[in-house]
């Protein structure tokens, strides 16, 4: 969903959705339904600590390098 800037992930991103009672049923039902999350709520997982982390950029030998701010570990290199 690029126009909405939302992602539908394979992890459990479900929200409860209520269905009102119909004429035949006594009670309404609560159904779990997959829901998209906004791009700003997605975080990179640090490979060392296995927790969400922010990403920093530093220059090493003339190249931009991304690193995890929690563990200070290099993630990959960019040109």
Curated annotation (Swiss-Prot):
Subunit and interaction comment: Part of the 50S ribosomal subunit.
Record-annotated membrane-spanning stretches: none
One Gene Ontology MF term: rRNA binding
Keyword Cell cycle: no
The keyword rRNA-binding is assigned to this record: yes
InterPro entries xref list: Rib_uL2_dom2, Ribosomal_uL24, Ribosomal_uL24_KOW, Translation_prot_SH3-like_sf
Listed name of the protein: Large ribosomal subunit protein uL24
UniProt xrefs under Pfam families: ribosomal_L24 (PF17136)
Superkingdom of origin: Bacteria
GO cellular component: ribonucleoprotein complex; ribosome
Organism: Onion yellows phytoplasma (strain OY-M)
């Amino acid at each position: 969903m690029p126009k909405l800037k939302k992602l539908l992930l394979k992890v459990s991103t479900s929200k409860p959705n209520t269905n009102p009672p119909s004429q035949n049923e006594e009670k309404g039902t609560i159904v779990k339904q997959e829901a998209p999350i906004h791009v700003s709520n997605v975080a990179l997982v640090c490979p060392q600590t296995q927790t969400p982390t922010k990403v920093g950029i530093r220059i090493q030998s003339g190249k931009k390098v991304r690193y995890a701010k929690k563990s200070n570990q290099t993630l990959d290199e960019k040109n």
